[in-house]
Structures are given as C-alpha cells and as structure tokens.
Curated annotation (Swiss-Prot):
Cell location: Secreted
Transmembrane segments: none
Function: Contributes to protect fish blood from freezing at subzero sea water temperatures. Lowers the blood freezing point. Binds to nascent ice crystals and prevents further growth.
Site (Important for ice-binding): 9, 14, 18, 44
Identification of the protein by name: Type-3 ice-structuring protein HPLC 12
Tissue expression summary: Detected in blood serum (at protein level).
Major localization listed first in the record, in broad terms: secreted
UniProt record similarity statement: Belongs to the type-III AFP family.
InterPro entries: AFP_Neu5c_C, AFP_Neu5c_C_sf, Antifreeze_III
Domain of life: Eukaryota
Assigned keywords, A-Z: Antifreeze protein, Secreted
CDD domains according to UniProt: Antifreeze_III
Organism, as annotated: Zoarces americanus
C-alpha cells in the first residue's frame, strides 16, 4: 500500500507547507504520494486542512496533477 501525505496539524488556508505540518500514512482514499513531501514544502494550501486530513492534489496550489 502506498503512503499518502496527511496533515500533522491544522493547516490554515493560504499557509505555506513545511515538513513539520505533514506526515506519511497509508490511508484510503489515497492522496498525494508521500514521496512528494519534499516538493510540497513552501507550496500553499487553498483551504483549511484539519489535523489528520489526507492532502489531495486539489488542496495544494500549483501541485501538478498526477
């Protein structure tokens, strides 16, 4: 099973992502792959992301589609 990126804390809208905000976890449905965590650093979320929420490609501004 592939690990996805999950919010490690509440991430407010328009916040630039940092490593501390994200963790990898095997979840369903699958979100952004965990190996993309380094690419996500400094990208902004376009909505508030609650703790434990899987990051989906449409939540991150400028994240390339799969």
């Amino acid at each position: 099973n592939q690990a996805s990126v999950v919010a490690n804390q509440l991430i407010p809208i328009n916040t630039a992502l940092t490593l501390v905000m994200m963790r990898s976890e095997v979840v369903t449905p699958v979100g952004i792959p965990a190996e993309d965590i380094p690419r996500l650093v400094s990208m902004q979320v376009n909505r508030a992301v609650p703790l434990g929420t899987t990051l989906m490609p449409d939540m991150v501004k400028g994240y390339p589609p799969a």
